[in-house]
């Protein structure tokens, strides 16, 4: 985690926005701070942003600490999401394999080009992926414990993923764990009803 912080955080503000997508995301957060409208923010002063608001909320919250929206503050949520995902992934692998394997997996994750690019960009992808990956790890742990109770933290994170880029943030983790359970011999209907309930709970913030 320390290596990832040293590789990513110091360089977030070193380059200006280099694609059309980055300023398009940042301008929505800027409009939130200027207008005070955090529910229906606008893009370029007139168009209502068509993506769910969680990523924009993140940029606006970080930028409010700095006093303005900058390249650093706009990219920081993506970097923070990556670091959280990497820590969770390390803990997940270390518990089921060993620390050496977890460390190697973390280095491979950090050195993956597309993952690194998403971690230093002002785009929704890294935040959504982090929520999905962490949710998958939590759902896997829930499955290991016999699917007892409701995995509330996974539900919360899937809800955040849904608020970041739509229903795929809940559907994908539930579908992955559902397929895994079927391959492990669990009956279709038991897997279906338990995961549908979890998925519906995670949709509550989206409504």
Language-model regions, residue ranges each:
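Membrane-integral, polyisoprenol-dependent glycosyltransferases
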Residues: 1-207
